[in-house]
Amino acid sequence: MTGVSHRFPCRVYYEDTDHGGVVYYANYLKFMERGRTEYLRSAGIELDSIEKDKGVMFAVTEANVRYLSPALFNDLLEVESTLTHARGARLTFNQQIWCIHRKHKTRDTLLTEAEIKLACIDRDGNARRIPASLIPVLNIHQTKELANG
């Protein structure tokens, strides 16, 4: 279940920046959250549905982030998310945020990289195993991604 990447484009808006037009450091975590959500959505996993139907959700328990270069107002970014671990009650993602070159529309600069660990929890905040029905969905998604890659 490792090695499959999902790419999510996003734009830096004024609200994401400080007074100097540089992305505020905590906002990279928001971009990564969106990237993980879209990764799971592309695998057919809707986070609101699993909370409603299975009574579980995923909570970040650890974020190890390296800031390498700043993103600026109006930059086009690409969040790459790779699921590297799914076992028991834990998911681990490696994520990178790239700046996309304005003219060539290709990756230009690696801005941020992170390892994000999540726990599967119930509505009371207690750890729960990842529902067995979600694991095959992720495996099917991986097979599709590898076939399309």
Predicted regions and their residues:
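Hot-dog-fold acyl-thioester-processing enzymes
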Residues: 2-59, 121-149
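Helix-adjacent hinge/juxtasegments
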Residues: 57-83
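HotDog/MaoC-like acyl-thioester-processing domains
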Residues: 5, 41, 71-76, 84-149
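Short, well-ordered turn and helix-capping elements at secondary-structure junctions
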Residues: 12-16, 62-69, 101
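Preference for bulky hydrophobic residues occupying beta-strand positions
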Residues: 10-12, 65, 81, 95, ...
